[in-house]
Structures are given as structure tokens and as C-alpha cells.
Amino acid sequence: TGLIYVAARNAEQFTARYGGINRVVFIKYDALDELNIIATPDYIIHGAGLASPELYTSKPVETILSNFDGVHSLLSFAKANHVKRVLYISSSEVYGKKRSEKPFEEGTYGEIDIDNIRSSYAIAKRASEMLCKSYCLEYGVDVVIARPGHIYGPSSKQNDKRVSSDFAFRAAFGDKIVMKSSGIQKRSYCYSIDCAVQILTILLKGECGQAYNIGHDEITTIRKMATIIAQAGNVKLEISDPTENDIKDFNPMNNSALNNDKIKKLGYVDTFTVE
């Protein structure tokens, strides 16, 4: 049996989550710093980076560099140390906005507004994906890409302001849920355990240089998600007008539903529904 190295910035958070597992080892790591890893792993899963909408606008430089420089250093490490495979966790935001109501397939893309500072995240993910594909083509580094949609579950942090996490924590504390939009936006909400299974499926069965959606067959609106959580927590659901700061952080994609056919061909099957 091998070891699992968890590279992260915060040792206290690591201990709280993984401290009782003997095979899991902490490595101090910041995607913005120079890579300093003594061990040579067989597989690398790169999921580091800023993942909160309010940071995309307040820290766009760090948002871009933690993605691009972070994956660049790991790809270079993998090339030099003959790592078996690298999996880069990208995002469904690489797809951008489109007029069609159909779920996104991996080869279908919409528009990303390069003048909107919030696009720092989506553009960084697109650039990082291209770097992964380039390392695969030019240097033969075995790398695959995962594109998660909207993931929810018990691993969420209380300061996570994405709607599924924010709504869940409000309901858990008995507070009313406040929606800042009509909630008609379409999403592919995926439970964290299903997400983990899909990541491992891509890691073990995916094709080098290819990207795979991580989502769920069930397409859900934000309003439906809010209603389900409010009912489960027995709290009120209200709609209020968004502030300018709220609007600045909004995901511009009214439809970010994902087509899961490609990962299903690797043998993956959904387990959990939103309900």
C-alpha cells in the first residue's frame, strides 16, 4: 500500500480533515511559490487555486497565476521525474456563455468576456488546459483534464459563497435563504462523492490530453436547488435585489449544464441526486 501526499497551505486544516489517516502525509505547498517536493509520486492531482467568485475580482492576479504557474511547475516536475499521470482539475467555466439551452459537450464552447475581470478564472483555466495538452503533445507527459460543474457536499467551507454552499450553511444554522436572482440559471449539481469517483475514473481510464466533464445527468436550476435546501432545513426562501458587488461576482453563465456522455463511456454511473 502506498502513501497519499496532500500538498496544501494550511497544516491545521489538513490535520482537522486527514490527521487520523496513517497513509496520508502533509506537504507544505502554495501554487504561487516555487515547487519543493522531495517525494516522487506515481500520480499527481492538481486542484490548487482560488475557487471563490469574490476572489476572482479582488485577487485576479493570484487567481490566474495559482492556476497557470501552479500547473506549469507540476507538469515540469512530472516531465523530469517520469510521473505516470497528471490530472488537472479545471472548471466548467471554460465553456463561457452560449445561447443554446443544451448541456455543454467537451468540444462545444461559448464566449468569455475578456474585458470582465471576473473572467480571470475562466481564462486561467483555459490557458492551463492548453498547457496540459501542449505538454502531452510536445513532451509526452501523460495528463488528463477534469471539468467539474457545481460541486456540493460536506467538504464545503463556511466561507464558501457559492450558492449551493451558502444556502446549505444558512439552512443548517436555521437562517433564511436569500436568493439574489430569479434562480432560472441551469446547473449540473454534483455531490462531492460522485465528483471524487469521476476524478478517479478520469485519472485511471481517461485518454491523455483529453478533457472530461464532471457533473450529473439531472439538470437543476438554482431556484430548485434553493427550494430543496430550504425545505430540508425548514427555513424560508426569499428573493432580494442584488447589490453591485453581488452582480460583479456572479457567474455570467445562465446555462452551465454539462453533458456527461464522455465520462460514462469510461464506465462511470451517477449515484446521488440533488434530493
Give the label of every model feature segment.
Residues A48, L87-S92, R147-G149, G215:
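Active-site beta-alpha turn of Rossmann-fold NAD(P)-dependent dehydrogenases/reductases
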Residues T1-Y43:
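N-terminal Rossmann/SDR dinucleotide-binding element
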Residues A171, D175, M179-E275:
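C-terminal substrate-binding subdomain of Rossmann-fold SDR/epimerase-dehydratase oxidoreductases
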Residues K28-S66:
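NAD(P)H-binding glycine-rich loop region in Rossmannoid oxidoreductase-like domains
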Residues K98-G107, M130-R187, S192-T201, T227-A232:
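NAD(P)-dependent short-chain dehydrogenase/reductase
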Residues H46, L65, H72-R118:
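Conserved Rossmann-fold NAD(P)-dependent oxidoreductase catalytic core, especially the SDR/UDP-sugar
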Residues R17, E54-E62, K97-K102, S156-K157:
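Conserved catalytic-core motifs of eukaryotic protein kinase domains, centered on the activation segment
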Residues S120, A124-A127:
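Active-site helix of classical SDR
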